[in-house]
Amino acid sequence: MAHYFVGDVQGCFTELQKVLEKVDFNPSQDELWAVGDLVARGPDSLATLRFFKSLGDSAKTVLGNHDLHLMAIHGKLKRDKPSDNLKALLKADDINELIDWLRQQPLMRELPEQQLIMTHAGVPPQWSLETLRQESALVSHALKQDDYLEALISQMYTDSAERWEPTALGIARLRFCINALTRMRYLYVDGHLNFDCKQPPQDCTDPQLRPWYEYTSPLRQSHTLVFGHWAALMGNVNDKKLKALDTGCCWGEHLTLWHLEKDQKITQKRLKKS
């Protein structure tokens, strides 16, 4: 069995199919792992979600910020923008089933035997594996409740949850986990999150900011960390234990697939624009 990890698809369904053809992906034998942000901006978020849902146990995804934003739009908590490119998905007959499927997806997944962890944006350097499991499980539990829109989604939008507080309770605790695992790029030297800078490290002019993965972390030493979210990196992190897979397909660049067992990246150029 092969494990394939794909970067932010964001509705680029044709490119996803093309890159899977290149490796002869067989869902009866192989697994497709996705770093989240299956939807938004690209031309066919509906087909993308339907495809991943149809794969059953052969697909393993985590939630990204755009996936959570889709829940907010569907729940009438946010309005969709033209740039979201979600109208066909929101009007689909099976939208409720697709949202329910998304709600079952976690913020982190792991392959313990490979010492591999996958999240959308990364892992806070302060966190141990036990903390990562615990905090992501709290968010997953909240998403599966009937009142998830009121109790979680309606309250998750804030830039104030930028600092890890181990004693925090309720929504404050969940907010930090969502921010860290789905939105994080840079940290200040004291460890709190910065949400403004999205440039690659070589273009960041604030001396107080460093990419999250440059801080000392027990998980960075022991595990391979697979993530997406940060298209400006274009996969360039110069560390064999970091797999940055968002390479900007929805922005006209390419989609990246990583074959775990061969430690090989396969790419597909963007074929059409939304």
Swiss-Prot record:
Gene3D superfamilies reported in the protein's UniProt record: 3.60.21.10
Pfam families the record matches: Metallophos (PF00149)
Alphabetized UniProt keyword annotations: Hydrolase
Organism: Shewanella putrefaciens (strain CN-32 / ATCC BAA-453)
GO biological process: RNA decapping
Catalyzed reaction equations: P(1),P(4)-bis(5'-adenosyl) tetraphosphate + H2O = 2 ADP + 2 H(+)
A GO CC annotation given for this chain: cytoplasm
Function, as annotated: Hydrolyzes diadenosine 5',5'''-P1,P4-tetraphosphate to yield ADP.
EC numbers for this chain: 3.6.1.41
InterPro entries: Ap4A_hydrolase (IPR050126), ApaH (IPR004617), Calcineurin-like_PHP_ApaH (IPR004843), Metallo-depent_PP-like (IPR029052)
First-level EC class: hydrolase
UniProt xrefs under NCBIfam families: apaH, PRK00166.1
Protein name from the UniProt record: Bis(5'-nucleosyl)-tetraphosphatase, symmetrical
Family: Belongs to the Ap4A hydrolase family.
Gene Ontology MF: a single term: phosphatase activity
